[in-house]
């Protein structure tokens, strides 16, 4: 798969799934796209709280990179995938396992 095809597929998938351009760039100059999910949860002895899942995605030299941030805590590593479609399938699964919907 060529870098041009990967970029084209990436842009289509990003548009279809509601990610927005944050205006930020990685140190290598790649544009970062982001989407955030929120839900209200009941916490024992605390009451109602907001549960947040934020996913940032960008493409670096033809490789989709995904960064997961849950309740303000950054996951231990940046995930990389072999294609934009695989990255989006993984994001959908992460969102589903978090109890949220795309």
List PLM regions with ranges.
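Mixed-charge, Lys/Arg-enriched low-complexity segments
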Residues: 63-102
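Generic short N-terminal amphipathic or hydrophobic helices
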Residues: 2, 12, 54-58, 68
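Compositionally biased, low-complexity intrinsically disordered regions
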Residues: 8, 50-52, 86-89
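N-terminal non-cleavable signal-anchor helices
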Residues: 7, 14, 33, 42-44, ...
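N-terminal regions of proteins, emphasizing targeting and processing segments when present
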Residues: 10, 17-18, 45, 59-61, ...
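Amphipathic, interaction-prone secondary-structure segments
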Residues: 17-65
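Acidic/proline-rich low-complexity IDRs
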Residues: 2, 52, 99-101
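Amphipathic alpha-helical segments
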Residues: 2-23
